Amino acid sequence: MLYKSPSDWNTSQSKSIMLFGMSGLGKTYISELLRNNGDWFHYSVDYRIGTRYMGEHIADNFKKEAMSNPFLAKLLQTDAIYISANMKFNDLSPLSTYLGKPGDPSKGGIPFKEYMRRQKLHRDAEINSMLDTVHFIQRAKSLYDYDKFVCDTSGSVVEIVNCDDQDDKVMKTLSQYVLPIWIEGTEEHTEELVKRFTKAPKPMYYSENFLIECWNNFLKEKNIPETQVDPNEFIVWGYRKLLENRLPRYRKIAENWGIILKASDVAKVKSADNFTSLISANLKG
């Protein structure tokens, strides 16, 4: 572990952390707080995925849709217009839109085969974006003179890490440069996340085997072909299963390489100093 004791953490001029856990429990809230009032460099993995690795795929998807409109198609073919994704730290909708949801095309769904292809692209992009953390730690220091760095991970980081392998490439590399911190929710948090997701379901990234299992079980349970699947119904149906599947693996990552902070404690944090003190209190040694 990068910081072996509260003393190591408190006395270190350079502090680098990696926040992970389910979306909605405070990763980005804390990252923005540290950036805005604590002189921390904020590295958003989702933003990196969408801009560096998936940007061309996203833009091509927009162009494909535009080409179905004769008016826009002519302008595109003559380079009269330019189409690209306007990705922002606080608005990653172009990335989510590209990932899509499988099911009935008339309800906004895409074929499952195409959905799987996009999922694989996202996996590669997320692995590369996570490993880019090392470069950005060095870049933040050499270019902008930041001694403090927060890696704001995607909720799906657990899907690209083998938590049972101490030599996992992503975690073995990153644990040399950052302190991994799992923000752990309660059953009440899980229920709130499910309720929130049900109201506004969004595309998700799944591990391949888990996704195929969920898809086949859904088709069997509903007794329908994939072209009749309501995309939102499937995404909502699988969300709780996804949470339950991820939670023990989040814990294993924290036990192997980092520490655990309770979401209820993180929610009380109002300043960078509050947060660094909370980390210190949860480091052993």
Q: What does each model-found stretch correspond to?
A:
Residues 222-285:
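NTP-dependent small-molecule kinase module
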Residues 1-11:
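Pre-Walker A adenine-sensing motif
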Residues 28-41:
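A conserved segment at the C-terminal end of the G1
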Residues 54, 59-163:
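ATP-dependent small-molecule kinase phosphotransfer cores
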Residues 39-54:
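Short beta-strand-centered segment that lines the nucleotide-binding/catalytic pocket of NTP-utilizing
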Residues 152, 170-223:
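Conserved phosphate-donor/acceptor-positioning beta-strand/loop module used by diverse small-molecule
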